[in-house]
């Protein structure tokens, strides 16, 4: 890897992790379109650490509050403050974690074709558009999440294992389909990313333990810094943009990208 490849791939990870356009799809497509060599597992670990750091830093106050509400809900055995949201984040991670571990090799080898990415980009782009329209028509969106909502969103999140789906895209879609407000949909989706990214990091570190790779520390540091800053900026941008215009720009982008991929 050289500096230009490091910058581009770190930016892609940082920008696309929290945009509903699929970071994994773009990280697969760019090297294929540019004929770059594989960036290596160590680089993947580092840029994922960057995006994880960004979302934790952005939501640090809420995470602290959720942690204490979660803790006291266990002690007192009742819902305390936003403990239901905290439990939702925890329980909502279990399905994708289990399925991801069981089918890890299948996903990594058999679901990375451009054709599959093209289909998922289009199909889930259309679903995102429908969910956005449904949310716009919903005059009484829910400001709290129920256990049924958590169950539905967590099941839908499993689809994010397929490249091109977008974890943030499918979870925001699911949240809006069950009637959650746009604000809560984004919030729950981004909070769900914390344990999901953490789990993927653990799996990558396990794989990394069995490998021997030469590393360029300066490029890894550069990748971490760029992915962290770009991810943090993206979180701010996405929240403001969706609040103003909804999901339309992302739906249009996904449809254009999906059609383009079919001609490759």
UniProtKB/Swiss-Prot annotation:
The record's subcellular location field reads: Cell inner membrane
The top EC class, named as a word, is hydrolase
EC number, as in UniProt: 3.6.1.27
GO CC entries: plasma membrane
Q: Name one GO biological process term.
A: cell wall organization
Q: Which InterPro entries match?
A: UppP (IPR003824)
First-listed, main subcellular location of the protein, grouped into a coarse class: membrane
Reactions catalysed, as given in the entry:
di-trans,octa-cis-undecaprenyl diphosphate + H2O = di-trans,octa-cis-undecaprenyl phosphate + phosphate + H(+)
Transmembrane spans = 7-27, 41-61, 89-109, 114-134, 144-164, 186-206, 219-239, 244-264
Bilayer topology: Multi-pass membrane protein
- Keyword annotations of the record: Antibiotic resistance, Cell inner membrane, Cell membrane, Cell shape, Cell wall biogenesis/degradation, Hydrolase, Membrane, Peptidoglycan synthesis, Transmembrane, Transmembrane helix
Q: Name the Gene Ontology molecular function terms of this record.
A: undecaprenyl-diphosphatase activity
Any extra detail in the entry? Bacitracin is thought to be involved in the inhibition of peptidoglycan synthesis by sequestering undecaprenyl diphosphate, thereby reducing the pool of lipid carrier available.
Describe the task this protein carries out: Catalyzes the dephosphorylation of undecaprenyl diphosphate (UPP). Confers resistance to bacitracin.
Q: Which family does it belong to?
A: Belongs to the UppP family.
- Can you name this protein? Undecaprenyl-diphosphatase
Organism from which the protein derives: Vesicomyosocius okutanii subsp. Calyptogena okutanii (strain HA)
């Amino acid at each position: 890897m050289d500096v230009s490849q490091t910058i581009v791939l770190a930016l892609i990870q940082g920008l696309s992790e929290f945009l509903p356009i699929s970071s994994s799809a773009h990280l697969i497509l760019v090297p294929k379109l540019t004929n770059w060599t594989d960036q290596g597992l160590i680089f993947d670990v580092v840029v994922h650490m960057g995006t994880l750091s960004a979302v934790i830093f952005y939501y640090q106050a809420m995470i602290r509050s959720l942690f204490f509400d979660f803790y006291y809900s266990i002690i007192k055995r009742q819902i305390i403050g936003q403990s239901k949201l905290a439990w939702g984040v925890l329980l909502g991670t279990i399905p994708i974690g289990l399925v991801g571990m069981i089918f890890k090799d299948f996903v990594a080898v058999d679901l990375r074709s451009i054709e599959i990415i093209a289909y998922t980009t289009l199909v889930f782009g259309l679903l995102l558009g429908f969910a956005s329209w449904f949310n716009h028509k919903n005059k009484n969106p829910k400001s709290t999440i129920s256990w049924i909502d958590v169950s539905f969103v967590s099941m839908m999140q499993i689809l994010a294992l397929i490249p091109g789906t977008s974890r943030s895209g499918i979870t925001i879609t699911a949240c809006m389909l069950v009637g959650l407000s746009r604000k809560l949909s984004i919030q729950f989706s981004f909070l769900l990313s914390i344990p999901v990214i953490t789990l993927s990091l653990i799996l990558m570190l396990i794989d990394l333990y069995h490998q021997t790779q030469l590393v360029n520390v300066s490029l890894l540091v550069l990748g971490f810094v760029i992915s962290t800053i770009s991810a943090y900026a993206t979180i701010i941008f996405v929240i403001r943009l969706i609040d103003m215009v909804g999901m339309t720009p992302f739906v249009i982008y996904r449809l254009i990208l999906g059609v383009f991929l079919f001609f490759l």
